[in-house]
Amino acid sequence: TDTSTEEPTLETIAYTRKKRSGQLAASLDHLPTETIHYRLSEEEQVCLCCGEKTHEMSTQVRRELKIIPAQVEVVEHVQHIYSCRHCEKEGTETPIVTAKMPAPMYPGSLASPSAMAYLMSQKYSEGLPLYRQEKQLERMGVSLSRQTMANWMIYGAHIWLIHIYQHLQKKLRAEDIAHADETSVQVLNEPGRAATSKSYMWMYRTGRDVSPIILYEYQPTRAKEHPKAFLEGFSGYLHVDGYAGYHHVSNVQLVGCWAHARRKFDEALKSLPVALQKSDQPCGAKTGLQFCNRLFAMDKKINQRKDCTPALRYEERLKQSQPVLDDFLAWLQTEQQRVAPKSKLGEAIIYCLNQWSKLITFLEDGRLELDNNRGERAIKPFVIGRKAWLFSTSQKGAKASAMIYSIVETAKENDLDPLKYLTYVLEQLPLIDLTDEA
């Protein structure tokens, strides 16, 4: 053994995380607080040393969380009716006066605004399907079938929430930047269609610089007529993926999604042998991915500037992103001539070339985004919820789901508690003259 050979130095990498002391405690300050005091009795307030009376010098506080489970109560609305005994004795016409009582939200049912809001919130915000809510209510001593719960929510959506939904749709159409996306949904009882037929939930939302609005719309197909009809009156930029159905929407400039373009090159890279993926050896998939990464890195750096505005973003993109795009396009056109079109890399190149006019639209306005991730994030709650409840039974139920999801997700985006907001609107809407458009 050559003892003169030095052993390699081992580098120890230590990670230091900032201690988040007090963050949780501070986040509880807005909650109702119950205070319990623990004091010595008069007999115990005696010094163990000299026998004199002690005094309170300080306190120490321990905090803990108390969770109060949901509970169900019955509310009886008793309406009192009055008449005049004097008129009764005189034999004259007796006037009868009935005390005013708020109209029921759902006549002939046990549904209250709070009960309906709770069921909606549990399913569409917390992802709890109706069969599990049915079991949960049974444990609370209430026998409420999932069919009854479904009927309540369909009624609440089609009679009350539809007014908010339609108002939000008008607001969204008045904007000049929007995002769109769509995903499949199964509806069992659609007229003239098999239960296994694929239907669609479409999503439309506002851009980043205005008050958030997220709207879902159920349609039995993925046909081009649906986004065209929903966005009738909208004029401006529409962030989309590569689906051709959006091409027929009138008065819009489509904005392509660089996240989709990047994903194509990422898939092309992953289709290569692992050794080549991890090596420094250049290849087309890596080059395409690097072009996309440069665009995202530039945009991130611009957005992180304290003085970032849409105007600044527009100017900086022309300076920084435009040259990269020019080089990327030249590379795509060259590579297309020598790459097999049906290979993963060929598919990525063709996708970018076919989408190019939409992919460079983000240069036209500093408010536009590089991708449609905002739209994809907005449709994700529906996709996650679908894994729990799997399907809708009827078209009416699917339309109700679209409206409820719209109200819930818009409330969340505006930092509102969905349960509290649903309760509020279901309490207030029956009291409003909804025929007055003003």
Q: Model regions: which residues?
A:
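Short, flexible loop/hinge motifs at secondary-structure junctions
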Residues: 1-110, 179-180, 206
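Mobile genetic element proteins and their domesticated derivatives, centered on retroelements
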Residues: 46-50, 84, 119, 133, ...
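Short helix/loop capping segments that flank catalytic or ligand/cofactor-binding pockets
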Residues: 56-58, 92-95, 187-189, 212-214, ...
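Structured ligand/cofactor/substrate-binding pocket environments in proteins
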Residues: 113-117, 123-129, 216-249, 398-405
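Conserved beta-strand -> loop -> alpha-helix junction used to position metal-binding or nucleic-acid-contacting
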Residues: 177-178, 242, 250-290
